[in-house]
Amino acid sequence: MKTFGKWLVLGLVILSSPVRAALDIVITEGIDAARPIAVVPFVWQGQGPAPQQISDVVMSDLTRSGTFKTLDELSLPQRNISAISQFQAKDWANVGAEAVVMGAIKPYGEDKYLVSFDLVDLVKAQMQSGTGPQSKQEFLIDSRETVISSAQFRQYGHRISDIIYEKLTGIRGAFLTRIAYVVVKHGEKSPYQLMISDYDGHNEQMLLRSPEPLMSPSWSPDGRQLAYVSFENKKAEIFIQDIYTQSRSKITSFAGINGAPVFSPDGKKLALTLSKDGQPEIYVVDISTKALKRVTNHYAIDTEASWFPDGKSLIFTSERGGRPQIYKVTLASGKVQRMTFEGEWNLGGSILPDGRSMIFVNRTNGKYNIARMDLETRFMQVLTSTRLDESPSVAPNGTMVIYGTTYQGKQVLAAVSTDGRFKARLPTGQGEVKSPSWSPFL
């Protein structure tokens, strides 16, 4: 567990190499409370075996969301239907699910496939099944078809999941997002690797490899860039790197601490921690001009800034009250307000996208856990039950938090829903994983 005020350092070798999916989400709690949904395997309407099964991606996404649980395929009364025209409401009368999705995949030219799917309101169909003939279109929640290539199967599966999630919850799905994180493989010549992958660990890519530690990746609002800290020149420096072109620029290289960079909501600035004038303080730097604005001025340590969605205020961690707590500073006035009071320490805060709640690390009785606090009522809920949690990062739809923790003596990533009901672990094969950062909507 990193302690407050401890600073890591980095260096690098730039790489861009796709590797196998290293993260494998293991659900540990909360599936019993999820909403049941049926996913019928999409029907392959071509010759030979199907290139891929999109419905497997959809089932995994919905289950991993913590909101839904998919029914066992063998329990489905109709297992070979591809459209609502084949749907028989009477067959589904005793199925305990709120919706069913079905679809088809068929060849559509060289390396092209037409994918169609229908999302059916099963509750409505069951309620009206005994009232006489009904138009099946009344049960249809959504229906779409799209032409994709073989390389787009997983991506389009995530897209279908996003549509289903939003149609049934009213909340935008986050299955087409990515995560950045640091992998440490002890014993190797360059053990530190900055990685990005799809939210579920697939399509993993190594952006940086270094003999020195890496830390604090932060996504730009457009999802094209990462800010991070590097010690490649034997001192802390902050860089921004384009994840597609690999081009990068040095943003700060002051004496002492250059740490915890985070993009502003408009992508034009970074909030960061510098100690160039003595104690660690919060600054904001204009990315294009490199102009600096000092935000805090206190003899205690100020660090780990995070933006409010409107870009007008920051939260940050400070020891100015004697122990690490989270404070809010209004950028226009410089007014500082303490936000947290419960527990021994509170640190590493992030504001949820709706601006109403805050996720952070709470230490009580020596245990570090992820917690959520309502900014209006100040009610705090501890979301996790492990001991050494750190570095929480919130999904762009505000429903899930990914964070670092310790499992069986190794640093791993884990996830928890923002209501605390669903928990999952993202173990890896080799090395330790830490410093996760969830991308914006892509």
Swiss-Prot record:
Enumerate the subcellular locations listed in this protein's record, separating them with semicolons: Periplasm
User: What's in the keyword line of the UniProt record?
Assistant: Cell cycle, Cell division, Periplasm, Signal
> What biological-process terms (Gene Ontology) are attached?
cell division; protein import
Q: Which domain of life is it from?
A: Bacteria
What is the first-listed, main subcellular location in coarse terms? periplasm
Entry's Gene3D superfamilies?
Answer: TolB, C-terminal domain, TolB, N-terminal domain
Give the SUPFAM superfamilies listed for this entry: TolB, N-terminal domain (SSF52964), Tricorn protease N-terminal domain (SSF69304)
Q: Which residues form the signal peptide?
A: 1-21
Pfam families under this entry?
A: PD40, TolB_N
Tell me which GO cellular component terms the UniProt record holds: periplasmic space
Look up keyword Magnesium and say if it applies: no
Quaternary arrangement and interactors, per the entry? The Tol-Pal system is composed of five core proteins: the inner membrane proteins TolA, TolQ and TolR, the periplasmic protein TolB and the outer membrane protein Pal. They form a network linking the inner and outer membranes and the peptidoglycan layer.
Give the function comment from the record.
Part of the Tol-Pal system, which plays a role in outer membrane invagination during cell division and is important for maintaining outer membrane integrity.
Question: Which PANTHER family has this protein been placed in?
Answer: PROTEIN TOLB, PROTEIN TOLB HOMOLOG
Protein family membership: Belongs to the TolB family.
Q: What protein is this chain from? A: Tol-Pal system protein TolB
Protein source organism: Shewanella sediminis (strain HAW-EB3)
